[in-house]
Amino acid sequence: MAQRTRLGDLLRPLNSEYGKVVPGWGTTPVMGIFMALFLVFLLVILQLYNRSLLLDGITVNWNGLG
């Protein structure tokens, strides 16, 4: 028999919806928006690293990071 703990009692409500699927798209569009924003963020970082995106007055020195 499993031992009951206070932490387990606090976390039990989080697991009460296990296995249930909400019909429809749910929060999928929100996830898609955040994934697109994260992609834009990564592209900006990549362009800064490759010096394809130059910002006036901001010098980028990647040698200090290594």
Curated annotation (Swiss-Prot):
A GO biological-process term: protein stabilization
Membrane-spanning parts: 29-49
Compartments in which it is found: Cellular thylakoid membrane
Signal peptide residue numbers: none
Entry superkingdom: Bacteria
GO cellular component: photosystem II; plasma membrane-derived thylakoid membrane
Pfam families recorded: PsbH
Keyword Ribosomal protein: no
Major localization listed first in the record, in broad terms: membrane
Keyword tRNA processing on entry: no
InterPro entries: PSII_PsbH, PSII_PsbH_sf
Gene3D superfamilies referenced in this protein's UniProt entry, alphabetically: Photosystem II reaction center protein H
Annotated membrane topology: Single-pass membrane protein
NCBIfam families named among the record's database cross-references: PRK02624.1
Task performed by this protein: One of the components of the core complex of photosystem II (PSII), required for its stability and/or assembly. PSII is a light-driven water:plastoquinone oxidoreductase that uses light energy to abstract electrons from H(2)O, generating O(2) and a proton gradient subsequently used for ATP formation. It consists of a core antenna complex that captures photons, and an electron transfer chain that converts photonic excitation into a charge separation.
Subunit structure: PSII is composed of 1 copy each of membrane proteins PsbA, PsbB, PsbC, PsbD, PsbE, PsbF, PsbH, PsbI, PsbJ, PsbK, PsbL, PsbM, PsbT, PsbX, PsbY, PsbZ, Psb30/Ycf12, peripheral proteins PsbO, CyanoQ (PsbQ), PsbU, PsbV and a large number of cofactors. It forms dimeric complexes.
PANTHER family: PHOTOSYSTEM II REACTION CENTER PROTEIN H
Stated family: Belongs to the PsbH family.
Protein name: Photosystem II reaction center protein H
Originating species: Synechococcus sp. (strain RCC307)
